[in-house]
Swiss-Prot record:
Matches recorded under Gene3D superfamilies: 3.30.70.1730, 6.10.250.2350
Family named by the database record: Belongs to the universal ribosomal protein uL10 family.
Listed name of the protein: Large ribosomal subunit protein uL10
Species of the source: Pseudomonas savastanoi pv. phaseolicola (strain 1448A / Race 6) (Pseudomonas syringae pv. phaseolicola (strain 1448A / Race 6))
Physiological role: Forms part of the ribosomal stalk, playing a central role in the interaction of the ribosome with GTP-bound translation factors.
Length: 166
C-alpha cells in the first residue's frame, strides 16, 4: 500500500519529534510476533513513557538524520520497530528485553544512547540503568550510611575522652 507524500512527511515529523525528545532508542525486528502481543507491548510502552512505532526504513533514516540516533542507520533493514525512551534512558531497553523473553521471534537489533551505538549484546548495560527513584534511593542510602558512620565515630571519640578523663 502506497503512502501519500503528505502522510510520509507527517510520519517523519512525528518520529523526528519523538527522537529529539528521546533519551535513548532501541531498534528491533518484530517479524512473527502476534498482533495481540504487539498490542500488549504498546500498552506497556505507553505506561513506561516509551514511544514505540513501526516505520519504513527510508522514512526512519530521514527522521533521525539530524539527531543523536543517526548512528542506528545501518540497522534499519527489514521491518523495523523503534522505541524512544522519554522519561528514563533504560526504559525502552528494559521493555524490549522483557518482551523478548516471552517472544522467540522478537529480535533486538541495536540501541543508541547519548550518540553512541550499542550492539544487541550490549543492551543489558542500558536496561540495567537504575530508574530515577532507584538512583535517588541508592544515593540516600550511601549518604545515610556515611552520616551514621560519622556519628558512631564521634560517639567513640567522646567515649574515649570520657574514659581517659575518668
Amino acid at each position: 500500500m502506497a503512502i501519500k507524500l503528505e502522510d510520509k512527511k507527517a510520519i517523519v515529523a512525528e518520529v523526528n519529534e519523538a527522537a529529539k525528545a528521546g533519551l535513548s532508542a532501541v531498534v528491533a525486528d518484530a517479524r512473527g510476533v502476534t498482533v495481540g502481543a504487539m498490542t500488549g507491548l504498546r500498552k506497556e510502552a505507553r505506561e513506561a513513557g516509551v514511544y514505540v512505532r513501526v516505520v519504513r526504513n527510508t522514512l526512519l533514516k530521514r527522521a533521525v538524520a539530524d539527531t543523536e540516533f543517526s548512528v542506528l542507520n545501518d540497522v534499519f533493514t527489514g521491518p523495523t520497530l523503534i522505541a524512544f525512551s522519554n522519561e528514563h534512558p533504560g526504559a525502552a531497553a528494559r521493555l524490549f528485553k522483557e518482551f523478548a523473553k516471552g517472544q522467540d521471534k522478537f529480535e533486538i537489533k541495536a540501541a543508541a544512547f547519548e550518540g553512541k551505538f550499542l550492539a544487541a549484546n550490549q543492551i543489558d548495560v542500558l536496561a540495567s540503568l537504575p530508574t530515577r527513584n532507584e538512583a535517588i534511593s541508592q544515593l540516600m542510602s550511601v549518604i545515610q550510611g556515611a552520616t551514621s558512620k560519622l556519628a558512631r565515630t564521634l560517639a567513640a571519640v567522646r567515649d574515649q575522652k570520657e574514659a581517659a578523663a575518668a
